[in-house]
Amino acid sequence: LPIYSFAQIDEEKIGSWYMYFFTADFKESQFGVQGDIQYRNWNLGGDLEQLLLRGAMSYRLPDKSAKFAFGYAHITSGAFGASNSTSSESRIYQEVTVPQKMINGRLHLNHRFRYEQRFVETQDFRTRFRYNIFVNIPLNSKEIAKNTYYIALYNELFLNGEKEIGDGKMVELFDRNRAYMGLGYAINEKIRMQAGYMNQATNTVSKGQLQFSLHQNF
């Protein structure tokens, strides 16, 4: 987020993120596409924090031990409160996701490593490193199949690649951390939905967000 977005936010007010994620593999190929649309609010709705549009080409290793993606994102960020001012960011990114199962297959993990090249309005070119560990724990089945309820957890660490971002502004190496806990339900083999709570902490601000997401595999 642009620096001004965090200037006067209300840490006690719960925000809300409404998200749609999709993946589609090309038939008889390890290649595919993936992406997401996220509408983020400073409150439960109407005070825009961010509108994020992201898409990527993907390649999965034949043994499914890792998935690589190269993509682009466009982000519109809004200021907290009554102001209608916005700023924009274009972002190129590369990522690798490594799945893992533990405890006799009952614990479903995904390790995602992402490197971003960021073109933020009014700032110099920036880069950022991200590591996210996702953990899904099925409750009524060993696999996340149709009609499965599951606990969904993740923690994502963000690190800035540069400290100087232009116009005399400085940032720390640590950018932010997101910690999430939620409940998911697999409607069928291709569609899941989740709802949960995420806390996002920077060096100066900690704010809670309700998250509602739909995940679809084509």
List where the protein language model places each region:
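Transmembrane beta-strands of outer-membrane beta-barrel proteins
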Residues: 31-35, 53, 66-70, 107-113, ...
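Start-of-domain marker
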Residues: 8-71
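Bacterial Sec-dependent N-terminal signal peptides
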Residues: 1-10, 218
